[in-house]
Protein backbone atom coordinates (compact mmCIF):
# COMPACT_ATOMS: atom_id res chain seq x y z
CA UNK A 1 0.00 0.00 0.00
CA UNK A 2 1.39 3.41 -0.98
CA UNK A 3 2.28 5.70 1.91
CA UNK A 4 0.32 8.87 2.64
CA UNK A 5 2.32 12.15 2.51
CA UNK A 6 4.55 12.33 5.56
CA UNK A 7 3.40 15.82 6.50
CA UNK A 8 -0.18 14.57 6.55
CA UNK A 9 0.82 11.62 8.74
CA UNK A 10 2.72 13.74 11.27
CA UNK A 11 0.13 16.56 11.44
CA UNK A 12 -3.13 14.63 11.18
CA UNK A 13 -2.24 11.35 12.92
CA UNK A 14 -0.73 12.50 16.24
CA UNK A 15 -0.70 9.00 17.72
CA UNK A 16 1.41 7.51 14.94
CA UNK A 17 5.11 6.95 15.67
CA UNK A 18 7.41 5.93 12.84
CA UNK A 19 10.31 3.52 13.29
CA UNK A 20 13.57 4.71 11.77
CA UNK A 21 16.39 2.41 10.77
CA UNK A 22 19.66 2.23 12.68
CA UNK A 23 23.33 3.12 12.34
CA UNK A 24 23.93 2.46 8.67
CA UNK A 25 27.63 3.30 8.54
CA UNK A 26 28.62 1.28 11.58
CA UNK A 27 26.31 -1.57 10.57
CA UNK A 28 27.89 -1.77 7.10
CA UNK A 29 31.30 -1.77 8.77
CA UNK A 30 30.22 -4.65 11.01
CA UNK A 31 29.19 -6.52 7.85
CA UNK A 32 32.61 -6.16 6.28
CA UNK A 33 32.25 -3.01 4.18
CA UNK A 34 35.28 -0.72 4.26
CA UNK A 35 34.01 2.77 5.11
CA UNK A 36 37.40 4.17 6.11
CA UNK A 37 37.02 7.02 3.65
CA UNK A 38 36.50 10.80 3.69
CA UNK A 39 33.03 10.09 2.28
CA UNK A 40 32.41 7.42 4.96
CA UNK A 41 29.39 5.19 4.34
CA UNK A 42 28.82 6.62 0.84
CA UNK A 43 32.12 5.07 -0.29
CA UNK A 44 30.63 1.85 -1.77
CA UNK A 45 28.39 3.85 -4.11
CA UNK A 46 31.35 5.68 -5.65
CA UNK A 47 32.62 2.48 -7.27
CA UNK A 48 31.16 1.58 -10.66
CA UNK A 49 31.26 -2.08 -9.64
CA UNK A 50 28.65 -1.40 -6.93
CA UNK A 51 26.02 -0.91 -9.62
CA UNK A 52 26.58 -4.34 -11.13
CA UNK A 53 23.82 -6.80 -10.10
CA UNK A 54 26.47 -9.28 -8.97
CA UNK A 55 28.21 -6.77 -6.67
CA UNK A 56 28.90 -8.21 -3.22
CA UNK A 57 28.88 -4.76 -1.62
CA UNK A 58 25.47 -4.08 -3.17
CA UNK A 59 24.16 -7.32 -1.67
CA UNK A 60 25.46 -6.31 1.76
CA UNK A 61 23.71 -2.93 1.56
CA UNK A 62 20.48 -4.61 0.46
CA UNK A 63 20.74 -7.16 3.28
CA UNK A 64 21.23 -4.35 5.80
CA UNK A 65 18.12 -2.52 4.59
CA UNK A 66 16.18 -5.80 4.52
CA UNK A 67 17.15 -6.60 8.11
CA UNK A 68 16.14 -3.14 9.31
CA UNK A 69 12.76 -3.50 7.57
CA UNK A 70 12.21 -6.97 9.02
CA UNK A 71 12.98 -5.45 12.44
CA UNK A 72 10.13 -2.97 11.93
CA UNK A 73 11.60 0.13 10.27
CA UNK A 74 9.01 1.95 8.18
CA UNK A 75 11.10 5.04 7.48
CA UNK A 76 14.64 4.61 6.20
CA UNK A 77 17.53 6.83 5.17
CA UNK A 78 19.62 7.21 2.09
CA UNK A 79 23.28 6.45 2.80
CA UNK A 80 24.33 10.00 1.95
CA UNK A 81 25.31 11.56 5.28
CA UNK A 82 28.82 12.38 4.09
CA UNK A 83 27.96 12.63 0.40
CA UNK A 84 28.04 16.43 0.14
CA UNK A 85 29.39 17.71 -3.17
CA UNK A 86 32.56 19.10 -1.62
CA UNK A 87 33.60 15.79 -0.04
CA UNK A 88 32.58 13.73 -3.06
CA UNK A 89 34.32 15.98 -5.60
CA UNK A 90 37.51 16.21 -3.54
CA UNK A 91 37.82 12.49 -2.80
CA UNK A 92 36.30 10.56 -5.71
CA UNK A 93 36.25 10.57 -9.50
CA UNK A 94 32.95 12.49 -9.43
CA UNK A 95 34.06 16.05 -10.18
CA UNK A 96 31.19 17.89 -11.87
CA UNK A 97 27.75 18.91 -10.63
CA UNK A 98 26.16 16.93 -13.45
CA UNK A 99 28.02 13.76 -12.45
CA UNK A 100 27.16 14.42 -8.80
CA UNK A 101 23.47 14.73 -9.64
CA UNK A 102 23.57 11.38 -11.46
CA UNK A 103 25.38 9.88 -8.45
CA UNK A 104 22.69 10.99 -5.98
CA UNK A 105 19.88 10.03 -8.36
CA UNK A 106 21.27 6.49 -8.57
CA UNK A 107 21.53 6.16 -4.79
CA UNK A 108 17.99 7.43 -4.21
CA UNK A 109 16.52 5.29 -6.99
CA UNK A 110 18.33 2.19 -5.72
CA UNK A 111 17.09 2.79 -2.17
CA UNK A 112 13.50 3.52 -3.13
CA UNK A 113 13.32 0.50 -5.40
CA UNK A 114 14.60 -1.73 -2.63
CA UNK A 115 12.48 -0.44 0.28
CA UNK A 116 9.29 -0.22 -1.79
CA UNK A 117 6.54 2.36 -2.06
CA UNK A 118 4.92 1.71 1.32
CA UNK A 119 7.86 2.97 3.40
CA UNK A 120 9.11 6.53 3.82
CA UNK A 121 12.54 7.62 2.62
CA UNK A 122 14.67 10.32 4.24
CA UNK A 123 17.29 12.14 2.19
CA UNK A 124 20.17 12.28 4.67
CA UNK A 125 22.29 15.44 4.71
CA UNK A 126 25.19 15.61 7.14
CA UNK A 127 26.42 18.89 8.69
CA UNK A 128 29.26 21.13 7.55
CA UNK A 129 31.13 19.45 10.40
CA UNK A 130 31.14 16.13 8.53
CA UNK A 131 33.48 17.60 5.93
CA UNK A 132 36.03 18.56 8.59
CA UNK A 133 35.26 15.90 11.24
CA UNK A 134 34.06 18.09 14.10
CA UNK A 135 30.56 16.75 14.76
CA UNK A 136 31.55 16.06 18.37
CA UNK A 137 32.95 19.54 19.07
CA UNK A 138 30.96 21.96 16.92
CA UNK A 139 34.18 23.95 16.56
CA UNK A 140 33.72 25.75 13.25
CA UNK A 141 36.71 28.03 13.70
CA UNK A 142 36.92 31.66 14.81
CA UNK A 143 34.21 32.95 12.44
CA UNK A 144 31.45 30.35 12.00
CA UNK A 145 29.07 33.14 11.03
CA UNK A 146 31.07 33.68 7.82
CA UNK A 147 30.80 30.11 6.51
CA UNK A 148 28.74 29.77 3.33
CA UNK A 149 26.39 27.08 4.62
CA UNK A 150 23.96 27.42 1.74
CA UNK A 151 26.71 27.03 -0.82
CA UNK A 152 27.89 23.91 0.99
CA UNK A 153 24.45 22.28 1.19
CA UNK A 154 22.99 23.52 -2.10
CA UNK A 155 23.91 20.69 -4.55
CA UNK A 156 22.67 17.92 -2.26
CA UNK A 157 19.67 19.88 -1.00
CA UNK A 158 18.49 20.82 -4.50
CA UNK A 159 18.69 17.21 -5.61
CA UNK A 160 16.59 16.00 -2.68
CA UNK A 161 14.10 18.86 -3.15
CA UNK A 162 13.50 17.74 -6.72
CA UNK A 163 13.56 13.97 -6.21
CA UNK A 164 10.05 12.57 -5.87
CA UNK A 165 11.35 9.45 -4.14
CA UNK A 166 12.46 11.51 -1.11
CA UNK A 167 9.68 12.08 1.43
CA UNK A 168 11.60 13.97 4.08
CA UNK A 169 14.94 15.80 4.09
CA UNK A 170 17.04 15.24 7.20
CA UNK A 171 19.69 17.72 8.31
CA UNK A 172 21.51 15.43 10.70
CA UNK A 173 23.91 15.89 13.62
CA UNK A 174 23.97 19.71 13.53
CA UNK A 175 26.48 20.76 16.23
CA UNK A 176 26.81 24.53 15.73
CA UNK A 177 24.31 27.32 16.41
CA UNK A 178 25.40 29.44 13.42
CA UNK A 179 24.76 26.51 11.10
CA UNK A 180 21.39 25.85 12.74
CA UNK A 181 20.37 29.50 12.36
CA UNK A 182 21.38 29.42 8.71
CA UNK A 183 19.19 26.39 7.99
CA UNK A 184 16.29 27.92 9.90
CA UNK A 185 16.59 31.10 7.82
CA UNK A 186 15.97 29.32 4.51
CA UNK A 187 12.50 29.76 3.06
CA UNK A 188 10.29 27.42 1.03
CA UNK A 189 12.14 28.27 -2.19
CA UNK A 190 15.34 26.84 -0.69
CA UNK A 191 13.85 23.88 1.22
CA UNK A 192 10.73 23.01 -0.73
CA UNK A 193 9.65 19.76 0.93
CA UNK A 194 9.20 18.56 4.52
CA UNK A 195 12.42 18.51 6.53
CA UNK A 196 13.76 18.03 10.03
CA UNK A 197 16.83 19.13 11.93
CA UNK A 198 18.64 16.68 14.20
CA UNK A 199 20.84 18.38 16.80
CA UNK A 200 24.13 16.97 18.05
CA UNK A 201 23.90 17.46 21.81
CA UNK A 202 26.38 16.54 24.56
CA UNK A 203 25.74 14.87 27.92
CA UNK A 204 25.11 18.27 29.51
CA UNK A 205 22.21 18.89 27.10
CA UNK A 206 24.20 21.52 25.21
CA UNK A 207 24.71 21.80 21.49
CA UNK A 208 28.30 20.76 20.83
CA UNK A 209 29.38 24.40 20.55
CA UNK A 210 27.93 25.13 24.00
CA UNK A 211 24.57 26.62 22.98
CA UNK A 212 21.72 25.72 25.32
CA UNK A 213 18.43 24.17 24.22
CA UNK A 214 16.70 27.21 25.70
CA UNK A 215 18.69 29.52 23.40
CA UNK A 216 17.72 27.35 20.44
CA UNK A 217 14.04 27.36 21.37
CA UNK A 218 14.04 31.14 21.90
CA UNK A 219 15.50 31.58 18.42
CA UNK A 220 12.93 29.26 16.83
CA UNK A 221 10.02 30.94 18.60
CA UNK A 222 11.41 34.33 17.63
CA UNK A 223 11.17 33.46 13.96
CA UNK A 224 7.38 33.37 14.28
CA UNK A 225 5.61 33.07 10.95
CA UNK A 226 8.90 33.62 9.09
CA UNK A 227 9.91 30.04 9.78
CA UNK A 228 9.86 27.67 6.80
CA UNK A 229 6.45 25.97 6.73
CA UNK A 230 8.16 22.75 5.68
CA UNK A 231 9.96 22.37 9.03
CA UNK A 232 8.15 19.25 10.21
CA UNK A 233 10.19 18.05 13.18
CA UNK A 234 13.07 19.00 15.45
CA UNK A 235 15.09 16.46 17.36
CA UNK A 236 18.39 15.00 18.45
CA UNK A 237 20.60 12.32 16.99
CA UNK A 238 24.04 10.83 17.55
CA UNK A 239 23.54 11.53 21.27
CA UNK A 240 24.30 9.47 24.36
CA UNK A 241 21.81 6.65 24.86
CA UNK A 242 21.78 7.20 28.62
CA UNK A 243 21.07 10.94 28.30
CA UNK A 244 18.80 10.87 25.25
CA UNK A 245 15.48 10.66 27.11
CA UNK A 246 16.36 13.60 29.36
CA UNK A 247 17.59 15.65 26.39
CA UNK A 248 14.38 14.97 24.47
CA UNK A 249 12.29 15.84 27.54
CA UNK A 250 14.06 19.20 27.78
CA UNK A 251 13.55 19.86 24.07
CA UNK A 252 9.85 18.97 24.43
CA UNK A 253 9.51 21.38 27.35
CA UNK A 254 11.12 24.19 25.36
CA UNK A 255 9.18 23.43 22.14
CA UNK A 256 5.94 21.85 23.40
CA UNK A 257 4.04 22.12 20.12
CA UNK A 258 6.79 20.76 17.91
CA UNK A 259 6.79 17.12 16.72
CA UNK A 260 10.11 15.57 17.70
CA UNK A 261 12.39 12.81 16.52
CA UNK A 262 15.19 11.02 18.29
CA UNK A 263 17.77 8.45 17.29
CA UNK A 264 20.53 7.99 19.86
CA UNK A 265 23.70 5.97 19.65
CA UNK A 266 23.81 2.43 21.02
CA UNK A 267 25.27 3.42 24.37
CA UNK A 268 28.83 2.64 23.41
CA UNK A 269 31.17 5.62 23.61
CA UNK A 270 33.24 6.81 20.64
CA UNK A 271 36.82 7.96 21.07
CA UNK A 272 37.40 10.35 18.13
CA UNK A 273 41.18 10.33 18.59
CA UNK A 274 41.52 6.55 18.57
CA UNK A 275 38.43 6.05 16.35
CA UNK A 276 37.23 3.22 18.57
CA UNK A 277 34.06 2.37 20.50
CA UNK A 278 33.83 1.01 24.04
CA UNK A 279 31.10 0.12 26.51
CA UNK A 280 30.37 2.63 29.29
CA UNK A 281 30.97 1.71 32.91
CA UNK A 282 27.52 2.86 34.04
CA UNK A 283 24.48 0.69 33.45
CA UNK A 284 22.32 1.45 30.43
CA UNK A 285 18.54 1.65 30.48
CA UNK A 286 16.82 -0.78 28.13
CA UNK A 287 15.09 0.29 24.94
CA UNK A 288 11.60 -0.32 26.32
CA UNK A 289 12.11 2.08 29.22
CA UNK A 290 13.76 4.66 27.01
CA UNK A 291 11.23 4.49 24.18
CA UNK A 292 8.35 5.00 26.63
CA UNK A 293 10.03 8.23 27.74
CA UNK A 294 10.51 9.24 24.10
CA UNK A 295 6.83 8.69 23.30
CA UNK A 296 5.73 10.52 26.45
CA UNK A 297 7.77 13.53 25.33
CA UNK A 298 6.52 14.02 21.82
CA UNK A 299 8.67 11.70 19.72
CA UNK A 300 7.09 10.90 16.35
CA UNK A 301 10.11 9.23 14.74
CA UNK A 302 12.33 6.94 16.81
CA UNK A 303 15.36 5.01 15.64
CA UNK A 304 19.03 4.48 16.24
CA UNK A 305 22.27 6.17 15.25
CA UNK A 306 25.87 4.93 15.56
CA UNK A 307 26.35 1.25 16.48
CA UNK A 308 22.63 0.47 16.58
CA UNK A 309 21.69 -2.73 14.79
CA UNK A 310 18.52 -4.40 13.48
CA UNK A 311 18.23 -6.01 16.92
CA UNK A 312 17.99 -2.54 18.49
CA UNK A 313 15.40 -1.45 15.93
CA UNK A 314 13.31 -4.55 16.69
CA UNK A 315 13.33 -3.63 20.38
CA UNK A 316 12.35 -0.05 19.53
CA UNK A 317 9.50 -1.26 17.30
CA UNK A 318 8.21 -3.56 20.03
CA UNK A 319 8.22 -0.73 22.58
CA UNK A 320 6.53 1.69 20.17
CA UNK A 321 3.77 -0.88 19.59
CA UNK A 322 3.31 -1.08 23.33
CA UNK A 323 3.36 2.61 24.24
CA UNK A 324 2.07 4.61 21.27
Swiss-Prot record:
GO terms for cellular component: cytoplasm. PANTHER family: HOMOCYSTEINE S-METHYLTRANSFERASE 1-RELATED (PTHR11103:SF10), SLR1189 PROTEIN (PTHR11103). Residues 6-320 form the Hcy-binding domain. Zn(2+) binds at residues 238, 305-306. The keyword Amino-acid biosynthesis applies. Keywords: Amino-acid biosynthesis, Cytoplasm, Metal-binding, Methionine biosynthesis, Methyltransferase, S-adenosyl-L-methionine, Transferase, Zinc. It comes from the Eukaryota. Its EC number is 2.1.1.10. Its cofactor is Zn(2+). Its main location: cytoplasm. GO terms for molecular function: S-adenosylmethionine-homocysteine S-methyltransferase activity; S-methylmethionine-homocysteine S-methyltransferase activity; zinc ion binding. One of its GO terms (biological process) is methylation. InterPro entries: Betaine-hCys_S-MeTrfase_BHMT (IPR017226), HCY_dom (IPR003726), HCY_dom_sf (IPR036589). This is Homocysteine S-methyltransferase 1. It is found in: Cytoplasm. Pfam families: S-methyl_trans (PF02574). Transmembrane segments: none annotated. Homocysteine S-methyltransferase involved in the conversion of S-adenosylmethionine (AdoMet) to methionine to control the methionine/AdoMet ratio. Also converts S-methylmethionine (SMM) to methionine. It catalyses: S-methyl-L-methionine + L-homocysteine = 2 L-methionine + H(+). Present with 606 molecules/cell in log phase SD medium. Gene3D superfamilies: Homocysteine-binding-like domain.
Amino acid sequence: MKRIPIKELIVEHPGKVLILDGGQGTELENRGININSPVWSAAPFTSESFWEPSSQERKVVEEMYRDFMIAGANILMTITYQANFQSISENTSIKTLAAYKRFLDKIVSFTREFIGEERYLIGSIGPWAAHVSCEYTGDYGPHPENIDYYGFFKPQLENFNQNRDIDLIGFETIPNFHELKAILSWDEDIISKPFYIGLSVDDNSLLRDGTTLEEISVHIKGLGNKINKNLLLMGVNCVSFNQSALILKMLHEHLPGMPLLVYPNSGEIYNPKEKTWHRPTNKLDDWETTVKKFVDNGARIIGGCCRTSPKDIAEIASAVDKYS
